[in-house]
A protein has these predicted regions:
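NAD(P)-dependent Rossmann-like dehydrogenase/reductase catalytic/cofactor-binding core
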Residues: 2-4, 232-350
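NAD(P)+-binding Rossmann beta1-loop-alpha1 motif at the extreme N-terminus of oxidoreductases
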Residues: 1-58
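Rossmann-fold dinucleotide-binding core
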Residues: 109-206, 211
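Helix-loop-beta segment of a Rossmann-like dinucleotide-binding subdomain
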Residues: 100, 144-158, 211-221, 287-296
Length: 350
């Protein structure tokens, strides 16, 4: 099959999904369908295209895309990039079964550790993962803000407990996104998928988790004395659980997180606290997507971020009191027991 004949779905074309679908289309792939339950977003993309605004570089483009709601799907896809929230994974994957070609695969880009859920429903041979290293915010029907620089965008892909036979196909598909922005490094092999997952999970648990319960940006969390101490503690809990799993953390932005932040001596802790604001400088204006969910009255996916660290820690006998507290507070906020406030930091013993 020619790559141009490959049928591709972006299932969950919110902020990140719209960016990926727009780039693949702009790069030259014509069989890319952007699928979302948001009917007004779908119609806007059908009428005027997908508009991507790169705030870091003050540039933008609009590209005509093929947008669908789930009810409008009629095709069977060779590759589905799963970009929804994890809370409904089983239901979503059961639905997608009928829309996969005989040897079709699902590549999940979700945060946390999502590949196992794909394998459970579809079988390990159809389960692939991608770690997406870019940020985006949904701002209106048909329009998305990209919070990363074009040349800084990356996607690392690999199979999950299978022979990785479709990794080459995924890399070729994603190379078209790279072509759209002259970024030859966009598509990359993930030689250590779980290491990359855990590195990103550690960052998300520390900063996205605390952003949910405090309402603060990542930069504010990394700057203020109490919050950055809690963030460092969460990062270390994630490192400890990953190590107990036998996972070697991948470098983040070229830096060895374990080496820079993992040391527990007084001097190494002091250095780590000094480095946190520097490390988060590029992401200082971000707030958690989970915070936005809660503000809109939705349940967030804290159980799949800090919650999965707590779950794995309990299974392996590794204490995770800080992650446990983030989960407790986030659910308390969802249920009206707590308010989103910086005062919630007082609940953390550090």
């Amino acid at each position: 099959m020619q790559i141009t004949d490959t049928k591709i779905a972006i299932y969950g074309a919110g902020a990140m999904g719209t960016v990926l679908g727009a780039l693949l289309t702009k790069g030259g792939l014509k069989n890319v369908h952007l699928i979302t339950r948001n009917e007004t977003h779908t119609k806007a993309m059908q009428d005027t295209g997908a508009r991507i605004v790169c705030v870091a570089e003050n540039t933008e483009f609009t590209v005509k895309v093929q947008a669908r709601t789930p009810a409008q799907i009629t095709d069977k896809y060779d590759v589905v990039f799963l970009m929804t929230k994890q809370r409904e994974n089983v239901k979503t994957l059961e639905f997608l079964k009928d829309y996969l070609s005989a040897d079709g695969i699902v590549c999940t880009t979700q945060n946390g550790l999502p590949e196992q859920s794909v394998a459970n429903v579809l079988g390990a041979e159809k389960a692939y993962g991608a770690v997406a290293s870019f940020g985006a915010t949904f701002v209106g029907e048909g329009s998305v803000l990209l919070t990363s620089k074009w040349q800084g965008m990356r996607m690392q892909v690999s199979g999950y407990e299978n022979d990785n036979a479709k990794q080459g196909l995924l890399l070729e598909i994603l190379s078209f996104a790279g072509k759209a922005i002259d970024n030859t490094a966009f598509a990359q092999k993930a030689d250590n998928l779980q290491g990359a997952r855990w590195s990103k999970l550690a960052i998300n648990s520390a900063f996205s988790g605390l952003s949910v319960v405090t309402g603060k940006t990542f930069g504010e969390i990394a700057k203020k004395r109490k919050s950055k101490k809690v963030a460092l503690g969460i990062l270390r809990e994630c490192m400890d659980v990953a190590t107990a799993q036998g996972v070697v953390l991948e470098k983040m932005q070229g830096h060895d997180m374990q080496k820079l932040l993992g040391g527990r001596s007084f001097l190494k802790t002091k250095l780590a606290l000094f480095l946190l604001p520097i490390a988060m400088r590029k992401h200082k204006k971000l707030v958690s997507g989970m915070l936005k969910d809660i503000e809109k009255g939705r349940k967030c996916e804290i159980d799949y971020i800090n919650g999965v660290v707590s779950k794995e820690g309990k299974r392996l006998g590794v204490p995770t009191p800080l992650c446990d507290k983030v989960v407790e507070l986030a659910h308390g906020i969802e249920n009206g027991l707590y308010e989103i406030s910086e005062k919630n930091l007082d609940f953390f013993e550090i």
